[in-house]
Design a protein with these regions (language model features):
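PAPS-dependent sulfotransferase catalytic core
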Residues: 1-69, 71-78, 103-104, 109-114, 218-269, ...
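Aromatic-acidic/polar surface patches that form glycan- and anion
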Residues: 18, 26-29, 33, 83, ...
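Residues at the C-termini of beta-strands that transition into short coil/loop
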Residues: 29, 53-55, 75-76, 94, ...
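A structural signal for well-ordered alpha-helical segments within the folded catalytic domains
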Residues: 30, 34, 95, 99, ...
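PAPS-dependent sulfotransferase catalytic domain
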Residues: 59, 74-92, 99-220
Length: 270
């Protein structure tokens, strides 16, 4: 049943949602998240959207889920989830992790190619400078140690580490666990998430929003911040073709093994 204080059309009462049942969208990069965020933000109204869209916007002990908002959406940690009202609706979206890795790579490459020389010299664009200067294999595995940590945190079985630690860059916390232990920890934490949708099943998200909140969103087949290739194109083979060695291809494929097993255990299709 929809919450009685919400409308049955395209919008929802953001004040009521903030007090009773905020929406929490755990946005994993390159999973159609900007499209979903835009639709939900329009539904609840901009002033009811948490300003924290990435974990880096809340340094130190600052909350990533500050109280009083109807929508929490972004590349954020979710360690504070239980501080929100008990009627919250928490969800995330997964896609084939190999396609996510490749999509992320080609998206960053496209962004880097659009920067001028001065912009590429800025510290915050160091990774984009490297993606232009290096082969794909060197980008993923060429170091130095600090950049390797960035690569591992964002590409190496990210679904497992994000769900297991509830943090965008929580992977170091798992260093003493076996792959099986990491997977079990991730699976255990999914009990705190109401729905996990495949990227191919966003129609169910639309239906769930309508049923739960009496409001309508349209996200199926609409993609914001898409990469340079057509949506129906598989990016993974194109990325593998840029990896020169068998060892490099095997190492890159290992970045998706745990996530593929996680999706299989969850019954979420790729």
């Amino acid at each position: 049943m929809p919450i009685s204080s919400l409308t049955s059309q395209a919008s929802a009462n953001g004040t009521a949602l903030a007090a009773q049942s905020p929406i929490v969208f755990l946005h994993i990069p390159k999973t159609a998240g900007q499209t979903i965020h835009n639709a939900l933000a329009a539904m609840v109204g901009g002033r009811h959207v948490s300003p924290i869209r990435t974990h880096t916007q809340a340094p130190g002990d600052a909350p990533q889920m500050p109280a009083g908002y109807a929508l929490y959406s972004g590349h954020i940690d979710w360690t504070e989830l239980e501080t929100l009202p008990g009627g919250r609706f928490t969800f995330t979206v997964l896609r084939d992790p190999r396609e996510r890795i490749a999509s992320f790579y080609f998206f960053l490459l496209k962004e880097a190619e659009a920067l001028d020389r001065d912009a590429l010299e800025r510290p915050e664009n160091h990774g984009k400078k490297l993606i232009l200067q290096r082969s794909a294999e060197e980008y993923f595995f060429g170091g130095p140690a600090g950049f390797n940590a960035f690569i591992r945190d964002h590409y190496d079985n990210f679904y497992v580490s994000y769900l297991a630690t509830r943090k965008m860059r929580g992977r170091p916390e798992l260093r003493d666990l076996t792959a099986a232990q990491r997977l079990e920890k991730a699976l255990a934490n999914t009990s705190h998430i109401d729905r996990i949708y495949p990227i191919s099943g966003l129609g169910q998200l639309e239906a769930d929003i309508a049923a739960r909140f009496g409001a309508q969103i349209s996200v199926t087949g609409t993609y914001v911040n898409a990469g340079p290739m057509a949506r129906e194109q598989s990016r993974w083979p194109k990325l593998l073709n840029r990896i020169a060695t068998d060892r490099g291809r095997a190492d890159l494929e290992a970045f998706a093994e745990g996530d593929l097993e996680l999706m299989e255990r969850l019954g979420v299709s790729t």
